[in-house]
Design a protein with these regions (language model features):
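Short, internal active-site loops enriched in acidic
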Residues: 7-8, 63-67
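Intrinsically disordered or low-complexity boundary/linker segments at protein termini
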Residues: 1-14, 81-251
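Short hydrophobic/charged patches on amphipathic alpha-helices used for structural packing
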Residues: 68, 72, 199-202
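A conditional alpha-helix N-cap/helix-loop micro-motif detector
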Residues: 32, 39, 64-65, 105, ...
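Soluble catalytic regions of membrane-associated enzymes that act on cell-envelope
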Residues: 35-65, 74-78, 82-90
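Non-transmembrane accessory domains of multi-pass membrane transporters/channels
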Residues: 1-44, 50-58, 143-149, 159-162
Length: 251
């Protein structure tokens, strides 16, 4: 699942990047032999999938009693193009000296907002509700505030994926111009659905993926009952850095 999500976002570019998979065990009294076993088990399935896709992934395993500080330090040291955090099925509101890495972590949901406050790179929170590779992919676009998502959307369409676009009904002509351009370039791959509220995002297929900005998620998540009915989510907080050279990955 982890690699398939990144493959959707970055396509062929994925193989050109340095990927780091990080797993943290909270505590300080773990037996070294047990730690080695946990490390091996944590990355087994991911490494199998990476080998199948011919993608190099470095494994980073640490035992710590300062989880948030450890992650923030690691991100600031590695300067990843994206930090991906796992949040289980619900979400409320990578080797040293190697820049340009993609990094993902499994994390307790109550720590995510704290980390978002402290790191500048794009942060993607994956809420897994039985996502199945190859299932329907949808983007939620709330207007020009979500313009940074178009870089991921465009790359996905370039790679031949079909995408459903949930568009907030707005009179913003600039935003509608971007949508019209997508429809002209990818008429057979885009399906438009205008929406007014979060209840319009509930679909019959439950194994798909719904991608939205963190800002849109914050605005839509007030109705927790409806949010629980949505398919798997990928919530992306935009890059806080400015003037970075790697616009394709970091917007």
């Amino acid at each position: 699942v982890l690699l398939s999500i990144y493959d959707l976002l970055f396509g062929k570019q994925l193989k050109k990047n340095h990927l780091i998979a990080a797993h943290y065990t909270v505590g300080t009294d773990l037996n070294p032999l047990n730690a080695e076993h946990y490390a091996s088990e944590s990355f087994a399935l991911l490494n199998q999938q990476a080998a199948k896709l011919n993608i190099q992934v470095d494994n980073h395993y640490r035992v710590t009693d300062k989880l948030v500080q450890e992650i923030i330090h690691f991100v600031r040291k590695e300067h990843p193009d994206m930090l991906r955090l796992g949040a289980g099925s619900h979400y409320r509101s990578d080797m040293p000296g190697t820049p340009g890495a993609l990094l993902w972590l499994t994390l307790f949901r109550d720590k995510i907002d704290e980390i978002m406050e402290q790191v500048k790179c794009p942060v993607a929170v994956f809420v897994n509700r039985q996502y199945r590779e190859g299932s329907a992919v949808s983007f939620v676009l709330g207007g020009m505030i979500d313009l940074f998502l178009f870089s991921y959307l465009d790359k996905m369409l370039q790679n031949g994926h079909s995408v459903r676009l949930f568009l907030f009904d707005t009179d913003d002509e600039e935003f509608r111009g971007h949508i019209d351009d997508l429809q002209v370039r990818y008429p057979e791959q885009t399906m438009i659905v205008w929406f007014a509220g979060v209840e319009d995002l509930v679909t019959e297929e439950k194994d798909g993926l719904l991608i939205m900005s963190h800002l849109s998620y914050t605005k839509l998540s007030e109705d927790e009952a409806v949010m629980r009915e949505l398919s798997s989510l990928l919530v992306i907080r935009r890059n806080k850095n400015t003037g970075d050279k790697n616009e394709g990955l970091e917007n």
